[in-house]
Amino acid sequence: MKKILALLLAITMIAAFCACAQKPADTTPADTSADTASDAPAASDGKLIKVGIINNDPNESGYRTANDKDLKAMFTEENGYDASFAYSLKNDEQIAAAQKFIQDEVDYLLISAAGTSGWDSVLQDAQAAGIQVILFDRTIDADESLYVASIVSDMAKEGQTAVDWLASQGLDSYNIIHIQGVMGSAAQIGRTGALDAQVAANDNWNMVTQQTAEWNAETAQQIVQSVIDSGKEFNVIYAENDDMAKGAVAALDKANISHGVGKDVIVMGFDCNKWALEELLAGNWNYDGQCNPFQASYIDAIIKDLENGKTPAEKTIIMDEKGFDASTITQEDVDNYGI
């Protein structure tokens, strides 16, 4: 009798085990996994979201290094993405990279354009292929219907804020060495435009020289050294990024020309690298204009909306930015805003 009962019990346990093994997957507890999925933008079929990211060379500047690092930290497999990156400071090479990403059938194309023009055709190709385009960092000259959103800096405002600050210094005359970034980029156009307008409108604003150093410190140093060697007088360095300002200062130091607060030459830069803000804090530079490189979280939020069938709340997001004056900057500013 005991043997019969034991046999019946064993059969019952086996039957119960089989029933558990055949239980449908969708009946398992899902609350925790659902919460996690809402945080990471997985595609509707559960696959990773394929993203092609076109950016400028990370070695271009401290700003670009921070921007690239921010993007790489966000667009990971852990966050639901399969991301590929392409880098160039040349528009034609970036456009070729975009065409390659279209052929690779990415889901999203993220672009920080080297130049503002020439993008219409490739964006039309992306649209025809059903690929969503998101601009970051810089604007382009293209119809807004060709991209779903843009998260960018207002480069014209950056330039105007800097020029307004310079005008507030009340110099009798402004003799300016203007060191430009890569010509045709949104950053160069915006930061140059405000200064050009101010020089054109005021007789006591003079452009001693205006040349591109293409964001490069060594080239900027050569430009300033050439002006020093020519014997032309100047009292302002307006450099369109921190690295070029650093190169300009190297030429001043070599020639024993004082610079900074209360000195012979006003030094201005853009990007707010931490080391540059420390130069302001020490009084060696006078002004630095912020350019916020941290766009990745905004892009991620937009992609989440699109994956959930929602239209982004804003077509264009302008990054919050400010300018810093050596006479008012604090260590807290350096710690909070330095990149």
Segments from the language model and where they lie:
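Hinge/cleft segment of the Venus flytrap/periplasmic-binding protein
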Residues: A40, K47-I49, I179, M183-A187, ...
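Hydrophobic alpha-helical
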Residues: I95, I102-A128, L195, A213-E278
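Hydrophobic alpha-helical segments within soluble ligand-binding/sensing domains
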Residues: D45, V51, Q94, S150-I176, ...
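Short, solvent-exposed amphipathic alpha-helices that sit
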Residues: G62-Y81, E158-A162, A186-W205, I223, ...
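Extracytoplasmic "Venus flytrap"
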Residues: K50-D70, M74-E78, S84-K100, S112-S117, ...
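Flexible loop/hinge segments that line or gate small-molecule binding clefts
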Residues: S117-K157, N273-L281, S327
